[in-house]
């Protein structure tokens, strides 16, 4: 990767827009210090030591008007996130003041940064690779401490190290094969080369397949489980949603059909982010608005990773209950018998044995739902092993799957007795695909597309 430092100077607001204690406007580039100094009244920023914070005021150089009282952080290249000169202006939080300072910096010669451009420069300047750059956004978007743990390990380079070490081993193997082909001084050189390839490709395949086994857990922790709460009207779906959220998001009444649409909320269940979808009760109805909600509920059920089927334990099973039991039987399903605080009338013998009796009203057995989720998706294992490297990014997972396919092609070719020089092609392809993960062999279009998904100022 080429080290690029011939960039213009960019600027953006790095804190969320709105009222707050502070706002931060960031500059990065060769002229960052000069541009910041042109609007700063205080110490000469071009002469202060690196990694210092300096008190002063931002002024409009045209009018001399004071815009705000600020603290300015100065960080000199190359010991910065972008490996360029970086200035961060810490202002009082607020839309007007941060925008005013941003416009001043642009007027003085800075360019408005594109989404993710600061991190893109860190990548292009060799400060981080592509997996570490993606981890930056994963940290920002992490919904639980477990998801953040995985993202921090990726930012620290755990996945990069594993991929780079594997690529180097593949390169060493290719070099040895090439030597054996070019200098066939021994009669058994072909057998030696075949044995080497077989041993190494099986080793690489085993390593990457083990990494793929972490993908299910990692992806769930990163993206969450899409969880549909289903049941006929007025069995307690919205009450369950509110109980899990510990706040009133859904309307709870005794009137069947109150939830007429799909309500979505995130909740942290023992470190697992659940995207809870409270669906309208699935039943036949003449109400047009409710019909739309019912259809969306069926769609949510089809797309869900997890289904919470709520039944009313104080009533006998209805045809609607039986229909939902059949509709959800092939899903990752947890059957919840609600209203167990009332007299029980439901026919337990008609239900699978793995139901959980609960009372949303008294909070009975709600904790068992969390335990069952752990059992269904994590085989009762710990969510995150401290020293393990996890795959959680769909792009990484897809590329690792492709590398495993390439290695399988090498092994299949060896079994068929194909010439070694032809099998080199698949092994070389494996090396190239792994390079796409770290960015060493990623096309420019992919890099541009990835960083365009970042937020402004990052």
Curated annotation (Swiss-Prot):
Sorted alphabetically, the keyword list is: Cytoplasm, GTP-binding, Hydrolase, Magnesium, Metal-binding, Nucleotide-binding, Potassium, tRNA processing
List the record's Gene Ontology CC terms alphabetically: cytosol
Binding positions for (6S)-5-formyl-5,6,7,8-tetrahydrofolate? 26, 88, 127, 458
Q: Does the keyword Ribosomal protein apply?
A: no
Gene Ontology molecular function terms on file: GTP binding; GTPase activity; metal ion binding
Q: Give the cofactors, semicolon-separated.
A: K(+)
Subcellular location as annotated: Cytoplasm
What EC number(s) are associated with this protein in UniProt? 3.6.-.-
- What are its GO biological-process terms? tRNA methylation; tRNA wobble uridine modification
Binding-site list for K(+): 234, 253, 255, 258
Q: Where does Mg(2+) bind?
A: 238, 259
Q: What is this protein called?
A: tRNA modification GTPase MnmE
Q: Which organism is it from?
A: Streptococcus pyogenes serotype M3 (strain ATCC BAA-595 / MGAS315)
């Amino acid at each position: 990767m080429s080290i690029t430092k011939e960039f213009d100077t960019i600027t953006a607001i790095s804190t969320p827009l709105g009222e707050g204690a502070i706002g931060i406007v960031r500059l990065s580039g060769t002229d960052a210090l000069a541009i910041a100094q042109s609007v700063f009244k205080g110490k000469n920023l071009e002469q202060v030591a690196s990694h210092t914070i300096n008190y002063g005021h931002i002024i409009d150089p045209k009018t001399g008007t004071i815009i705000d009282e600020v603290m300015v952080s100065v960080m000199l290249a190359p010991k910065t996130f972008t490996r360029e000169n970086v200035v961060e202006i810490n202002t009082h939080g607020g839309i007007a003041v941060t925008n005013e300072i941003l416009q001043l910096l642009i007027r003085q010669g800075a360019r408005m940064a594109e989404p993710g451009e600061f991190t893109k420069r860190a990548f292009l300047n060799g400060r981080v690779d592509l997996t570490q750059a993606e981890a930056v956004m994963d940290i920002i978007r992490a919904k639980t401490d477990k998801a953040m743990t995985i993202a921090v390990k990726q930012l620290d380079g755990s996945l990069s190290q594993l991929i780079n070490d594997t690529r180097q081993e593949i390169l060493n193997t290719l070099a040895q094969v090439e030597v054996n082909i070019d200098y066939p001084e021994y009669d058994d050189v072909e057998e030696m080369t075949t044995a080497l390839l077989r041993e190494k490709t099986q080793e690489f395949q085993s390593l990457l397949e083990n990494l793929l086994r972490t993908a299910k857990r990692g992806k769930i922790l990163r993206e969450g489980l899409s969880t549909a709460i289903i049941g006929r009207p007025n069995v307690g779906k919205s009450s369950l949603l509110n109980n899990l959220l510990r706040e009133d998001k859904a309307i709870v009444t005794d009137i069947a059909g109150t939830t007429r649409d799909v309500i979505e909320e995130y909740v942290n269940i023992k470190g697992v982010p659940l995207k809870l979808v409270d669906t309208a009760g699935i039943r036949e109805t003449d109400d047009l608005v409710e019909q739309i909600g019912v259809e969306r509920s069926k769609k949510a059920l089809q797309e869900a990773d997890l289904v919470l089927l709520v039944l009313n334990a104080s009533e006998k099973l209805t045809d609607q209950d039986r229909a939902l039991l059949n509709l959800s039987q092939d899903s990752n399903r947890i059957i919840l018998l609600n209203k167990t605080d009332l007299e029980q009338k439901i026919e337990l013998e008609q239900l699978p044995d793995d139901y959980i009796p609960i009372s949303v009203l008294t909070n009975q057995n709600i904790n068992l739902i969390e335990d069952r989720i752990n059992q269904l998706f994590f085989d009762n294992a710990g969510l995150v092993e401290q020293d393990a490297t996890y795959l959680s990014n769909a792009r990484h997972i897809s590329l690792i799957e492709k590398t495993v396919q390439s290695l399988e092609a090498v092994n299949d070719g060896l079994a068929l007795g194909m010439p070694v020089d032809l099998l080199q092609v698949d092994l070389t392809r494996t090396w190239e695909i792994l390079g796409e993960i770290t960015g060493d062999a990623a096309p420019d279009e992919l890099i541009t597309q990835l960083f365009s998904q970042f937020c402004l100022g990052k």
